[in-house]
Curated annotation (Swiss-Prot):
Subunit comment: Homodimer.
Cofactor dependency: pyridoxal 5'-phosphate
One Gene Ontology biological process: glycine biosynthetic process from serine
Binding site for (6S)-5,6,7,8-tetrahydrofolate: L133, G137, H138, L139
Family indicated by similarity: Belongs to the SHMT family.
Annotated Gene3D superfamilies: Aspartate Aminotransferase, domain 1, Type I PLP-dependent aspartate aminotransferase-like (Major domain)
GO molecular function, one term: glycine hydroxymethyltransferase activity
Cellular component terms (Gene Ontology): cytosol
Compartments in which it is found: Cytoplasm
EC code(s) of this entry: 2.1.2.1
Modified residues (N6-(pyridoxal phosphate)lysine): K242
Protein name: Serine hydroxymethyltransferase
Presence of the UniProt keyword Transferase in the record: yes
Length: 438
């Protein structure tokens, strides 16, 4: 073997066999530190969850090497016979999980799945209705800073000021007045049950499509803890992470064959090129997990834990928007503690409790300050936390917020936060992740 060939072989051996720690210790270190953070912190961000080892293995597989533009059986590249199997499994499992006739599992994100529906069903300048961001909607539901608000004429509906529940009379009135081509139901910070049947009645009355973005509650729908929108909506979108407990990505469901064709064309070639086959493999694994009987128990526990957390926070003098929760999340009004969302998020973070500042309906504060925080129970429930643990977590949150109120400064109360941090580390240590103790 020549010296050149020997050098090439040695280089190949390193390329295929050296570990991440050997090749890139900086990235390895960041990942190791992030694992430590996740292990020792209580994650209450409602849009986050923890995937199984099986999902991690699928998403970290050699499927990342394969380009697969197109759909199973109709690829623009050769060598797709095995990724076809993966995508077909993901599609069939998604259809079974949600009782849908058609599923597209290729969207790379929640934003892209919603963009694909708009591309399929709307023209620039068309009118659609969506939940106002300040009432719990999402950027892609018509926010003026988002493509959805720039390309279309958006009519937003909201919640009532007295009880913070969806104002269905307002939805009906706005629909009759504006004759939208599409009505979008679903949100990111609404803690009550959605009346899909009523939304469909309104949509039918004005000749609109009904689109449901169930990204936050898809796992609860799959687990039987929230009514399914699939029988009512013309098209449903959902992310595959959040309460569904899969990899980060999106999915589109419909029972209408004509809409399915439009959706497929909108996703590819309209919006995306080659799908992320390693992510689709992770989706397929997560769907298989969600089809198991134990996932129904998980979904029930998510809701039970959320209700327990909300009641515990109320017992400590905090207000919960709409008075409580029927799903996995809640908005906490911090004004009784004279705190802002920005200050509370930082103080809780110092105590190893992760959440996000969030506007509340009719919030007087600026969007990057806010009067509230959003809390969710999917990740903690995945770790094994039950009602007792979430009651303890509610008490710890109140302890930090009371300390923040006494300190009356952005720096918070260091002594209180350190004491709570130690309790958090002790609690999380009883529920290890990925086989690691401590």
């Amino acid at each position: 073997m020549s010296q050149a060939n020997a050098a090439t072989k040695a280089s190949s051996d390193v390329f295929f066999n050296a570990s991440l720690e050997d090749i890139d210790p900086e990235i390895f270190g960041a990942i190791r530190n992030e694992l430590g953070r996740q292990r020792h912190e209580i994650g209450l961000i409602a849009s986050e969850n923890i995937v199984s080892r099986a999902v991690l293995e699928a998403q970290g597989s050699i499927l990342t090497n394969k380009y697969a533009e197109g759909y199973p059986g109709k690829r623009y590249y050769g060598g797709g016979q095995y990724v076809d199997v993966v995508e077909e499994l993901a599609i069939e499992r998604a259809k079974k999980l949600f009782g849908a006739e058609f599923a597209n599992v290729q969207p790379n994100s929640g934003s892209q799945m919603n963009q694909a529906v708009f591309l399929a069903l709307l023209q620039p300048g068309d009118t659609f209705m969506g939940l106002d961001l300040n009432s719990g909607g999402h950027l892609t539901h018509g926010s003026p800073v988002n493509m959805s608000g720039k390309w279309f004429n958006v009519v937003s509906y909201g919640v009532r000021k007295d009880d913070h529940l969806l104002d269905m009379d307002e939805v009906a009135r706005l629909a009759r007045e504006n004759k939208p081509k599409l009505i979008l139901a679903g949100g990111t910070a609404y803690s009550r049950i959605w009346d899909w049947k009523r939304f469909r009645e309104i949509a039918d009355e004005v000749g609109a499509y009904l689109m449901v973005d169930m990204a936050h509650i898809a796992g609860l729908v799959a687990g039987g803890q929230h009514p399914s929108p699939v029988p009512h909506a013309h098209v449903c979108t959902t992310t595959t992470h959040k309460s569904l407990r899969g990899p980060r990505g999106g999915m589109i469901l419909t029972n209408d064959a004509d809409i399915a064709k439009k959706i497929n064309s909108a996703v590819f070639p309209g919006l995306q090129g080659g799908p992320l086959m390693h992510v689709i493999a992770g989706k397929a694994v997560a769907f298989a997990e969600a089809l198991k009987p134990e996932f129904k128990l998980y979904a029930k526990n998510v809701v039970d834990n959320a209700r327990a957390l909300a009641e515990e926070l109320k017992s400590h003098g905090l207000d919960i928007v709409s008075g409580g929760t029927d799903n996995h999340l809640m908005l906490v009004d911090l004004r009784p503690k004279n705190a802002t969302g920005k200050r509370a998020e930082a103080a809780l973070g110092r105590a190893n409790i992760t959440c996000n500042k969030n506007g509340i309906p009719f919030d007087p504060e600026k969007p990057f300050v806010t009067s509230g925080v959003r809390l969710g129970t999917p990740a903690g429930t995945t770790r094994g936390f039950g009602v007792a643990e979430f009651k303890e977590i509610g008490s710890l949150i109140a302890e930090v917020l009371d300390g923040l109120k006494v300190a009356n400064s952005d720096e918070g109360n260091a002594a209180v936060e350190q004491a709570v941090k130690e309790k958090v580390i002790a609690l999380t240590g009883r529920f290890p992740m990925y086989g690691y103790q401590g």
